[in-house]
């Protein structure tokens, strides 16, 4: 890309909520990112209502399936997935460790079914839901959490630096 971009954030909860972005539009954006040689960072996550209704798996699998429909592995394309429980974004609430492990496990399994074990093993699944310096290290230590998608805490340089340090070996 002429501007030096390497990643495209696709399907973020704010785009879905504020602009009514649909799964079909996410699919098209993943395809467009692929065509331009960008790594799509596909965001999936449930609302509080969907969570309370016991629909977490249904929602995140549906969203991931739509995104994967626009994805091609040809030419060494890459992909990242970010689980962002909508109810935890900007609220100061973070999903429990059990919630994160369960959701990331669902996403990992779906990736393996869809793109195969080898490719799926290379797809990092990020967590993005009120990540802050106090919880980053614990989140990063969980199974299938390959990184964090930082929102509000990235606006404070000191907070962001502490989160980055939590992810350093």
Residue spans of the language-model regions?
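Active-site loop-to-helix "anion-binding N-cap" substructures in soluble metabolic enzymes
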Residues: 1-169
């Amino acid at each position: 890309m002429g501007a030096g971009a390497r990643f495209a954030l696709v399907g973020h909860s704010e785009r879905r909520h504020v602009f009514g972005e649909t799964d079909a539009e996410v699919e098209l954006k993943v395809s467009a990112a692929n065509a331009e040689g960008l790594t799509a960072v596909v965001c999936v996550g449930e609302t509080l209502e969907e969570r309370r209704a016991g629909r977490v798996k249904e929602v995140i699998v549906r969203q991931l399936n739509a995104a994967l429909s626009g994805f091609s592995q040809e030419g060494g394309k890459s992909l990242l997935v970010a689980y962002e429980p909508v109810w935890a974004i900007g609220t100061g609430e973070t999903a429990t460790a059990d919630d994160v492990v369960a959701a990331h496990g669902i996403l990992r399994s779906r990736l393996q079914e869809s793109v195969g074990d080898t490719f799926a093993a290379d797809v990092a699944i990020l967590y993005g839901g009120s990540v802050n310096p106090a919880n980053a290290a614990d989140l990063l230590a969980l199974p299938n959490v390959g990184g964090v998608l930082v929102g509000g805490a990235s606006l404070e340089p000191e907070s962001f630096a502490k989160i980055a340090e939590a992810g350093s070996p």
